[in-house]
Amino acid sequence: MLQDILPHVYHSEYRNKTPEDTDIMIFQKGRELLLASDGSYSLPTVGQIRKICPETIKDSFYLFSVDEQGFYSVPDQVLEALPLPLTGPVFGKTTFSWQSVMALRETEHEWHAFGGAVGWHLANWYSLHRFCGKCGTETVHSETERAIVCPNCGHIWYPRISPVVIIAIVDGDRILLTRYNRNGYRRHALVAGFVEIGESFEEAVRREVMEEVGLRVKNIRYIESQPWPFSSSLIAGFSADVDGDPTVHLNTDGGEELAEAVWVDRETLTIEDTSVSLTWDMIRQFKDGVLSPSP
């Protein structure tokens, strides 16, 4: 999956350190990242940016490290000084331009995709907290931890992670596959949704399944989890057996998330996507017989 980057090691702890030329720069704008346009989706280095715009590096701030390679970003206002797209002798034959962060799902360089996605998550969070949500004062970065501090009222913000459940609903040798209605992902998926305030994971599983496909489930079992930076989420994967009638009733209240939900036999199940996501890792487990209904 996306986070499986061995032998590389992700270091999430905050470090107040100076960027080196071999470190990586994360430039984000909304849902876009500055990525190589050659299909590798690589990211520019500190050394490259230092040669064309040294002031940018002076304003950079630390995000995290993969092995000993640091990832850094810059405040939104600093982006205006960059001569975009990034091209020329400093970058060799590579041009860096704005591309969807979701492009990182398609690269074969796992640790680089992970670093870019997590970097986007954190850089986007910093961007959204430039001003205090309590008093409106411009915030500053903590020098001792990964946090945003208001110098006026003293309020402290930490990066947000939204909990999500994803459910492999099983009925004997069948699994329920869904297709989203509007989010741009056209391959099949599993029922999933955000956990509401005051809910347990298990309660969220039951609610999401009932809301989206009108089924009752039992034997809810935890499978595994995955950080999913693209939606600032931590996903908990579960399997569950149908409890009673397996007839699907799609939500049609006008805010429906799913375009379809179909039962697919294990023998005819086709793997449509890579195992970068927990969704397809769980579907593959069902295909291989690892994930089965409770006896």
Which residues make up each language-model segment?
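Short functional micro-motifs and their immediate structural scaffolds
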Residues: T137-V140, Y158
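N-terminal strand-loop-strand
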Residues: T144-L190, F194, R216-V217, A240-V242
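N-terminal alpha-helical interaction blocks
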Residues: M1-E108, P295
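Residues immediately within or flanking Cys/His clusters that coordinate Zn2+
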Residues: L128-H129, G136, A147
